[in-house]
Amino acid sequence: MRSKNDFAFLAESFLSSGISVALVGYPLGPDATMDEIVADAHAAIRYLAAELPKLGGDPRRVVVSGWSSGGHLATMVLDEPSLRAGLSISGIFELEPLLKSYVNDKLHMDAAMAQRNSPILQLPKSSKQLDLFAGSAELPEMRRQTADYASARRAAGLPVQYAEIPGANHYTILHNMMNNDGEIHQALVALLGGR
């Protein structure tokens, strides 16, 4: 299980600005298949939507975001009715290249499962805004996938913004989200509809 506690540090700058944050954990391979991981992410969004009014949250201002594999999941759940928009940081949008990598040693995906769970092949039906970010110092494949996914959304008439954070790599890009003046932080605030 990817622990939500590992990412609690990301919430601090938003909480200090009066923005509520829900951190979601999810199972990892080999304990779950990619289909199960994506289904779990959908279930988490539905649970949050049901509980949010009880917690005093505004159900019209729910934005899903994620980093790396969480960035992949954020795009896979974007059709959930309760979501206003999405933001993906350093996500993976085409899973077929993973089939021959060490990552698939734990995921055990076949070609059909990779296709079902590749955002670039499963564009959402809704026209919710999605902001995509990658670091300029990310691996070329990560940057290519992000740029290709942005292009696919544009070609389908879906709203998308794509930006590369100068000098950021797969890990340091999170500093841009934590910093109130960072482009990613500001984009998330804008997707929420302002403070």
Language model segments and positions:
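Alpha/beta-hydrolase superfamily serine-hydrolase fold, recognizing
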Residues: 1-195
